[in-house]
Amino acid sequence: MRSQPHVLSIVLAGGEGKRLFPFTADRAKPAVPFGGSYRLIDFVLSNLVNAGYMKVCVLTQYKSHSLDRHISQSWQLSGLAGEYITPVPAQQRLGKRWFTGSADAILQSLNLIYDEDPEYIIVFGADHVYRMDPEQMVKEHIESGAACSVAGIRVPRKEATAFGCIQADDDGTITEFLEKPADPPATPDDPDVTFASMGNYVFTTQALIDALKEDSEDENSAHDMGGNIIPYFVNRGEAHVHDFSRNVVPGETDRDHGYWRDVGTVDAFYEAHMDLISVYPVFNLYNRKWPIHTSDDSNLPPAKFVKGGIAQSSIVAAGCIISAGTVRNSVLGPGVVVEEGASVEGCVLMDGVRIGKGAVVRHAILDKNVRVGDNALIGVDRARDSERFTLSQGGVVCVPKNYELHGADED
């Protein structure tokens, strides 16, 4: 393992994820399945572990059972070596109240910092799809002498109005942090792009503690990391931007270098899946030099295709059975069954979905354990779909967890 300063990683995983409804109706956003075999939180945890950061606290709150279980079952490290990835629910250490913001979540968890006594603290979000080497950011943070570093991704200025935007000088010192500005600032070296905050931070420990305590005394604060804590450091001239375009991950290609996606809406979530199944995806799941880790599916049998069942341009996870059915341009999670004569096209099917004989499912996302009856139709009649399900702005049909759709002959 590479020699490193003493670092504690904190992952903020308490988000409700309302824009991903109905897939967050029963789980926290970081626990939403992604890419057939993963959960959203697997990406940030993989980045930390691949970089050698093995002391990780995941702060949870909203409907966290699924997330807690996934972390406990899939991310067991060697306690003998002092390594851990542990979910930490709201402890109510500062009174009988829940987290009121991301900064308050860390404030209420200061005991974790005091117990570990790190030199530096990584604070990352839990619900983005990307590869990143956090060690490079920590090293740059130390060399900069700043108290706070913010990872910034270069985006076209005309598209940056939906982000927290960073204005920095030539040496990377952040001079202004603007939340969703109408006129985003340009980067020092390119007038057509701006630095958008990725929600990933590195702090010198005592500086973060001081900022959190001062923020807690401000009755007008939203106690938010991006909205309050980062501006605190910017105003003091103590914030530095880490240019994500310079973060190089082993095994990456020119095509997927710098890939980062906020999949916080249904349409963004769907489009990220459709990228995965393209011939040359922008994001490569198959980079073995910087793998995305998740639960071990070795207890599931391999996917099986029988009676002429086929899958084209698709990702099919372990335990799936395609029996005389057809799957095209889709992502199937573990244990999905597609029966005789059924057609699945342009879909994301999560764990345990069953598609009945002769059913047609198109342009849809089906949550875990959905049952689609024989000859039933989804994504064929928009008016009918809108009566039964949620439709995204882009027209993606969203079928909630455990839903049972009767077959055509049962209506």
Curated annotation (Swiss-Prot):
Q: In which pathway does it act?
A: Glycan biosynthesis; glycogen biosynthesis
Question: By its UniProt entry, which InterPro entries does this protein fall under?
Answer: ADP-Glc_PPase, ADP_Glu_pyroP_CS, GlgC_bac, GlmU/GlgC-like_hexapep, NTP_transferase_dom, Nucleotide-diphossugar_trans, Trimer_LpxA-like_sf
Citing just one GO molecular function, the answer is: glucose-1-phosphate adenylyltransferase activity
Keyword annotations: ATP-binding, Carbohydrate metabolism, Glycogen biosynthesis, Glycogen metabolism, Nucleotide-binding, Nucleotidyltransferase, Transferase
Q: Which CDD domains match?
A: ADP_Glucose_PP, LbH_G1P_AT_C
Segments forming a coiled coil? none
Q: What does this gene product do?
A: Involved in the biosynthesis of ADP-glucose, a building block required for the elongation reactions to produce glycogen. Catalyzes the reaction between ATP and alpha-D-glucose 1-phosphate (G1P) to produce pyrophosphate and ADP-Glc.
The name this protein goes by in its record: Glucose-1-phosphate adenylyltransferase
Q: List the source organism.
A: Corynebacterium kroppenstedtii (strain DSM 44385 / JCM 11950 / CIP 105744 / CCUG 35717)
Provide the organism lineage as a comma list. Answer: Bacteria, Bacillati, Actinomycetota, Actinomycetes, Mycobacteriales
